[in-house]
């Protein structure tokens, strides 16, 4: 089984008519952060990536923490792996417990598990100082120890800031910045390649750092959004189906 998921197309090669896929090797690059301002296509890309995980990684399980709590993930309402707004702390704890169970041997499986947290920064800002620090420590635990147990983290938010990640920034080995990027974001997330990056890109295009390789990326358009939602739904519902024996 391949450990790779397609992220998008190489924009530089696409300009010459060559459709070359940019792939995420999640065994080598276990954790991801996606950022971009409103209108950048960040949510579209995040949904598409979750759908590919649900469809192409057998037995994958996804926990979605949707702090923004608008309509983008409302189709997941009622699923055991879906947490909204002030319920996001429970979703974070569920991911932590998944990793602990695998460490203890209570969960012997090594199937792909992902916690996707939408608007992590806004979530932290909603907490008091003590609770925010505890949440950052839980995230650091997942980022530092998750790889060996096939436990992964995907953070999606409008902008990046070191204050929201403690010392765990270097654990994000897949970084995707979409649309127009600020100079500060480029410096923080793409510092080794800052002189190569055009920070001004249209909606649906961006920069992808996959391990130590940098790409200009185009996110392909999908004409069947219901298929995307069905694929995400299947992965978020998997814990419930396993309990039911299906």
Language model features by range: what are they?
Residues 157-241:
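Conserved ATP-driven motor cores of ASCE-family P-loop NTPases powering translocation/secretion/packaging/pilus
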Residues 1-105, 111-114, 121-181, 190:
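P-loop NTPase catalytic phosphate-binding loop
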Residues 105-106, 242:
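Cell-envelope/extracellular anchoring and linker segments
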């Amino acid at each position: 089984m391949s450990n790779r998921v397609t992220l998008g197309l190489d924009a530089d090669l696409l300009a010459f008519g060559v459709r070359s896929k940019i792939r995420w090797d999640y065994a080598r690059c276990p954790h991801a952060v996606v950022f971009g301002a409103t209108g950048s296509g960040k949510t579209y890309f995040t949904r598409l990536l979750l759908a590919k995980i649900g469809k192409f990684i057998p037995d994958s399980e996804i926990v979605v923490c949707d702090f923004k709590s608008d309509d983008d993930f409302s189709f997941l309402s009622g699923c055991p792996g879906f947490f909204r707004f002030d319920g996001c702390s429970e979703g974070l704890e569920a991911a932590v417990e998944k990793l602990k169970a695998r460490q203890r041997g209570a969960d012997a499986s090594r199937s792909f598990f992902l916690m996707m947290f939408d608007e992590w920064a806004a979530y932290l800002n909603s907490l008091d100082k003590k609770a925010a620090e505890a949440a950052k420590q839980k995230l650091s635990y997942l980022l530092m120890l998750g790889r060996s147990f096939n436990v992964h983290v995907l953070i999606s938010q409008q902008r990046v800031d070191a204050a929201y990640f403690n010392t765990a920034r270097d654990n994000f080995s897949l970084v995707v910045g979409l649309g127009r990027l600020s100079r500060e974001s480029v410096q923080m997330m793409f510092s080794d390649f800052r002189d190569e990056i055009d920070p001004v890109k249209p909606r649906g295009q961006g920069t992808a750092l996959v391990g130590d390789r940098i790409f200009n990326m185009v996110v392909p358009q999908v004409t069947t959004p219901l298929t995307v939602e069905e694929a995400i739904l299947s992965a978020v519902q998997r814990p419930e189906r396993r309990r039911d024996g299906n």
